[in-house]
């Protein structure tokens, strides 16, 4: 009898596509207005001087300059700012 019994079915075998989040331009790097600095879920990083916040919490440069990361305030919030080159 050359028959093979049916194998079981698995409930695994799927995964979501990665969202490519994270810091895109690091401290000390030169940027132009419109460049994306950080892609994030929620405000892990807050917008400082010269930085805008998109509706999906993406941080982007509003002016030309150099990226600066800093921690400020009583809660230790991380801010991303643009300083003049």
UniProtKB/Swiss-Prot annotation:
GO terms for biological process: translation. Gene3D superfamilies: 2.40.50.100. The keyword Membrane does not apply. Keywords: Ribonucleoprotein, Ribosomal protein. InterPro entries: Ribosomal_bL27, Ribosomal_bL27_CS. One of its GO terms (cellular component) is cytosolic large ribosomal subunit. It holds the Pfam family Ribosomal_L27. Transmembrane segments: none annotated. The keyword Transcription regulation does not apply. PROSITE patterns: RIBOSOMAL_L27 (PS00831). One of its GO terms (molecular function) is structural constituent of ribosome. Belongs to the bacterial ribosomal protein bL27 family. This is Large ribosomal subunit protein bL27. The lineage of its organism: Bacteria, Pseudomonadati, Pseudomonadota, Gammaproteobacteria, Pseudomonadales.
């Amino acid at each position: 009898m050359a028959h093979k019994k049916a194998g079981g079915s698995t409930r695994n075998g799927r995964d979501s596509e990665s969202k490519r989040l994270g810091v895109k331009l690091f401290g000390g790097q030169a940027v132009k207005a419109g460049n994306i600095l950080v892609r994030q879920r929620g405000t892990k990083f807050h917008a400082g001087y010269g930085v805008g916040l998109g509706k999906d919490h993406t941080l982007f440069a509003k002016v030309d300059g150099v990226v600066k990361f800093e921690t400020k305030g009583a809660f230790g919030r991380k801010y991303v700012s643009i300083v003049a080159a």
